Amino acid sequence: MGTLSVNQNKLQKRLRRLAGEAITDYNMIEDGDKVMVCLSGGKDSYTMLDVLLHLQKVAPITFEIVAVNMDQKQPGFPEHVLPAYLKELGVEYHIVEKDTYSVVKELVPEGKTTCSLCSRLRRGTLYTFADEIGATKMALGHHRDDIVETFFLNMFFNGALKGMPPKLRADDGRNVVIRPLAYCSEKDIQAYSDMKAFPIIPCNLCGSQENLQRQVVKDMLVEWERKHPGRTESIFRALQNVAPSQLADRNLFDFTSLKIDENATPRFLDVLNI
């Protein structure tokens, strides 16, 4: 790629800066870490790898990067694309072969969404492989919009105030998942992917099928953002600014023991005596 335009340079710097801030804020990567970068062949994971490779060069700490792609044996999957790309970059990589495609097709009725089961099978396989290669962190390409969408999905359909944290210890306790693009918008990532002309691999497992619930939420957020620019960012900031005493979860705040503090200083004026 040739010299970047002013806007392209700003975009690149913004993504690198935001990823660096997220990594610092959540202590995602530490000195000596071996980071397994999970590549799907989509715009998000390509951008994540690109940004992490830059940060690896300029960071004040030393860490390894190992790229990993999971070949799920989908029909027509272009097996050559990622190896060729990673070889050209000179990045250490592994292709994990696991026929989850057949499992999903066997277990999920025709016409039903495959996303949930496919994701669980893929995640379990990658957790196991991360342990095998001694990876201390597992980097996923989820961005700010993914995190906000997941928050609303859980609220609307599961009745839970639960999102997708920038850093997470897996249920097995043996893997730490990080999301370096947590502060980055999908719009910026799409623009960067187009600019870099990454060799995108589409997911053909579900054909044209969409995860309908997620699409409903995505469309809602797009419409909100169109009418009120900055709303998605504001919602994301809210996830970082939680006040348990102002909600209703008894596990997070002790409402039952709440009583008057006899020694408290009055904060409000006695308007009757003014």
Curated annotation (Swiss-Prot):
Residues the record lists as binding [4Fe-4S] cluster: C115, C118, C206
BP GO annotations: tRNA thio-modification
InterPro entries assigned to the protein according to its UniProt record, in alphabetical order: Rossmann-like_a/b/a_fold (IPR014729), TilS/TtcA_N (IPR011063), tRNA_Cyd_32_2_STrfase (IPR012089), tRNA_thiolation_TtcA_Ctu1 (IPR035107)
Catalyzed chemical reaction(s): cytidine(32) in tRNA + S-sulfanyl-L-cysteinyl-[cysteine desulfurase] + AH2 + ATP = 2-thiocytidine(32) in tRNA + L-cysteinyl-[cysteine desulfurase] + A + AMP + diphosphate + H(+)
GO CC annotations on file: cytoplasm
Cofactor(s) required for function per UniProt: Mg(2+); [4Fe-4S] cluster
Enzyme class, first EC level, given as a word: transferase
Pathway: tRNA modification
Enzyme Commission (EC) number: 2.8.1.-
Keyword Protein biosynthesis: no
Keyword DNA repair attached: no
Major site of localization recorded for this protein: cytoplasm
Keywords: 4Fe-4S, ATP-binding, Cytoplasm, Iron, Iron-sulfur, Magnesium, Metal-binding, Nucleotide-binding, RNA-binding, Transferase, tRNA processing, tRNA-binding
Molecular functions (GO terms): 4 iron, 4 sulfur cluster binding; ATP binding; magnesium ion binding; sulfurtransferase activity; tRNA binding
SUPFAM superfamilies per UniProt: Adenine nucleotide alpha hydrolases-like (SSF52402)
Motif placement: PP-loop motif: 40-45
Cell compartments where the protein resides: Cytoplasm
HAMAP family, alphabetized: TtcA
Oligomer status and interactors: Homodimer.
Function: Catalyzes the ATP-dependent 2-thiolation of cytidine in position 32 of tRNA, to form 2-thiocytidine (s(2)C32). The sulfur atoms are provided by the cysteine/cysteine desulfurase (IscS) system.
Miscellaneous note of the record: The thiolation reaction likely consists of two steps: a first activation step by ATP to form an adenylated intermediate of the target base of tRNA, and a second nucleophilic substitution step of the sulfur (S) atom supplied by the hydrosulfide attached to the Fe-S cluster.
Family according to the record: Belongs to the TtcA family.
Protein name, per record: tRNA-cytidine(32) 2-sulfurtransferase
Gene (UniProt): ttcA
